């Protein structure tokens, strides 16, 4: 479904992508692949995803079907709100909840904490990603958290990552993980808060 969502995103953004240096050569934007063919690929991927989905319990199937509109409306968000990255996190981390439901056949606080934390993780890293295109996006009129927080990106990104790290700590606590888990958390803590946040150079496309 994620691949199908990416195709739908590229179809929806094809006119915008043509105007952005980094994305102008994407297959659909550059017309190497027609919109019709891309749509066929998306349908095929959806069918494959459905064939996989029907092997799970009914609760998982229902919850997965509920999430489908999210995947197909995400591409529109950048036209209306400065928070498309938040919507991306809500959409593409939904699989965390589905994975839990497929095994436990119920929803508990643990996957919800993890889901919310992962949503902030996506919000952080996709905000960084957005700085590659910020100059083109501002000219075109596309919205993003990269633009909204362009004057103080490090604080916002650090905040997102701190929420994510707190969620990992809480999940470990709720699942009674031993001390090795918390020691292991030092690695993402250093990577996210130092190398991805404090040392971030938003003016450098390569750094983003």
Q: Whereabouts are the PLM-identified features?
A:
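Aromatic-anchored, glycine/proline-accented short structural segments
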Residues: 100, 107-160, 164
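Transmembrane alpha-helical segments that form the membrane-embedded catalytic/substrate-channel core
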Residues: 2-8, 70-76, 94-98, 116-131, ...
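Transmembrane helical bundles of ABC transporters
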Residues: 3-11, 15, 19
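Intramembrane alpha-helical segments
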Residues: 26-113, 194-201
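Multi-pass membrane catalytic core of lipid/isoprenoid biosynthesis enzymes
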Residues: 14-64, 139-182, 186
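Hydrophobic residues within membrane-embedded alpha-helical segments of Major Facilitator Superfamily
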Residues: 1, 45-48, 52, 70, ...
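Alpha-helical transmembrane segments
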Residues: 172-177, 198-208
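Residue-level signature of catalytic and energy-coupling elements of molecular machines
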Residues: 13, 84, 133
């Amino acid at each position: 479904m994620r691949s199908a969502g990416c195709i739908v995103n590229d179809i929806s953004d094809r006119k915008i992508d043509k105007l952005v240096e980094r994305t102008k050569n994407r297959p659909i934007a550059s017309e190497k692949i027609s919109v019709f063919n891309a749509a066929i690929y998306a349908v095929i991927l959806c069918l494959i995803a459905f064939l996989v989905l029907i092997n799970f319990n009914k609760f998982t199937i229902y919850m997965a079907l509920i999430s489908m509109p999210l995947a197909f409306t995400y591409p529109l968000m950048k036209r209306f709100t400065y928070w498309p990255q938040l919507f991306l996190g809500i959409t593409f981390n939904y699989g965390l909840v589905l994975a839990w439901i497929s095994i436990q056949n119920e929803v508990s606080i643990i996957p919800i904490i993890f889901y919310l934390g992962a949503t902030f993780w996506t919000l952080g890293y996709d905000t960084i990603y957005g700085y590659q295109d910020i100059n083109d996006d501002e000219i075109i009129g596309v919205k993003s958290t990269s633009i909204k927080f362009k004057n103080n990106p490090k604080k916002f990104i650090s905040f997102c990552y701190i929420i994510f790290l707190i969620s990992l700590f809480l999940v470990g606590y709720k699942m009674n993980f031993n001390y090795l888990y918390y020691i292991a958390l030092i690695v993402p803590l250093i990577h996210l808060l130092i190398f991805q946040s404090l040392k971030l150079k938003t003016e450098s496309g390569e750094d983003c």
